[in-house]
Structure formats: C-alpha cells, structure tokens
C-alpha cells in the first residue's frame, strides 16, 4: 500500500537525520521548555520502528476491509494524522531549526500530497 511506503520512507528519513539535528533541537527547546527531555537516538529510532510496524498492521487490516466503513475510516484517520504531522511539528520545526528538521522533506513532498489525495478520494462502493 502506498501510504505504508510513504510512512516507511518518512520514518527512515527521521531516523537517519535525528542524530544530527538532536543537539540543535535540544538547544532550541531549552529556550522555551527548559525541562523537556529528548529521547536518546536509540529510543527515538526504536519508537519509529514500533510506530511503523503499528501503522503497517492498521493499514493491512484496513486494506482487507477497505470496502467496509471501518476499514475506510481507519485509512482516512491515518491520512488525517499524517496530514497533521506535516503541519504541526515538521514545517514549524524546520523553520525554527533554520530550514531542516528530520522528516520535513518526505512530510512535505510525499505525505502531504498523498494524505490530501486519500482524504479527497471516495470510498469504493460495496460489492
């Protein structure tokens, strides 16, 4: 499924870029939220692996029930989450970090248009 590939590529970008941007993000966060605790690189990457697996499981279930309202609703819900994920953390973080934040390239170039397409697309009629 296309959305799973988008999530996989996006989370891979985040996982690879996080170690390099973590110090800058921590320094920036200290100005506003001094008590914030950032995950270690390993914690962050493991969270991405678990999140990717969970999304894959939900998408596999949704694909098997795509003609049912609950499968289509699950797909629309995930697309909404990924659309919000572009708007809320990635774009503002990239601006605050001077132009790049982990995941912003795939968020804007892949997740944004794909999420909008899924949300606009109509459910297939039941057979």
How would you name each of these model-derived features?
Residues 112-127:
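Terminal transmembrane helical module of multi-pass membrane proteins
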Residues 1, 70-78, 127:
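Membrane-interfacial loop-to-transmembrane alpha-helix junctions, especially the N-terminal start
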Residues 35-53:
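A loop-to-helix transmembrane entry motif
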Residues 62-66, 87-96:
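Juxtamembrane "helix-exit" motif on the non-cytosolic side of transmembrane helices
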Residues 7-24:
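Transmembrane alpha-helix/helix-exit interface in multi-pass inner-membrane proteins
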Residues 8-12, 80-89:
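Aromatic-anchored segments of alpha-helical transmembrane domains
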Residues 93-109:
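Non-cytosolic membrane-interface motifs at loop->transmembrane helix junctions
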């Amino acid at each position: 499924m296309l959305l799973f590939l988008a999530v996989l590529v996006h989370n891979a970008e985040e996982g690879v870029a996080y170690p390099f941007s973590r110090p800058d993000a921590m320094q920036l966060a200290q100005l506003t939220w001094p008590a914030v605790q950032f995950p270690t690189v390993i914690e962050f990457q493991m969270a991405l692996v678990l999140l990717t697996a969970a999304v894959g499981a939900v998408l596999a279930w949704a694909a098997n029930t795509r003609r049912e309202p609950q499968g289509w609703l699950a797909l629309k819900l995930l697309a909404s989450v990924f659309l919000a994920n572009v708007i809320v953390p990635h774009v503002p973080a990239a601006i605050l970090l001077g132009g790049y934040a982990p995941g912003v390239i795939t968020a804007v170039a892949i997740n944004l248009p794909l999420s909008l397409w899924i949300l606009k697309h109509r459910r297939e009629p039941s057979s």
